[in-house]
Amino acid sequence: MNYMKWILLTAGLSIILAVNIFAQENVIMPDLTKIVSGDGWRVVNREPEMVTENGQSCVHFKAENETGGIAWLENVDFNNGIIEADLKGRNARGRSFLGIAFRGVNDSTYDVVYFRPFNFVPEANVKGHSVQYISHPKYTWFKLREEHPGEFENSIVPPPNPDQFFHVKIVIEKPKIKVYVDQQEEPSLVVDELSDRTGGKIGLWMDYVTEGMFANLKILQAEE
């Protein structure tokens, strides 16, 4: 190998190494076991417990009342990037709504990408209500469905098993949001954000009467 080739190879390896190190520094993998103790997390209207489901350790949120609930990750300000997690709801019609909140300001002001597992069954999935984006407090699911039908919710093809964990990857590059389910190459939902907020908290979100399980939360902060 001549000197010039050695220089180019060394430079290329240095760049790759630097990129990998930089990427690792921007990856956050929160410890979900700390949700139970409240260390670095703040839980609203839910009772968390650690359980093992199908061999996987996860946090289970019990619905003690009919109000919505959320677990806020403290001390992380998320702007753009990727949020991944494994979620499990229930195949119970009208009683399972869970997802990932971001752009969180307080307990009533945030954006959410959430899922309706009871709509994963084929006869319901075709109606286009399996995955939804909302922006509270102004843009509720009802307002968006009424004023922008089919724009902020969609089917998932192929749909996950409503009684099992499913993997979610949410790519956020303001104003664009893309939602991928179970390693699919094509997004199940693509929308433009409705809020003008930048940054904010990330949370594990459940609507009213919803119990939920969450595992393997991973956050990749985009380079600013």
Language model feature labels by segment:
Residues 9-20:
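Bacterial N-terminal signal peptides
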Residues 24-224:
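Extracellular glycan-recognition regions
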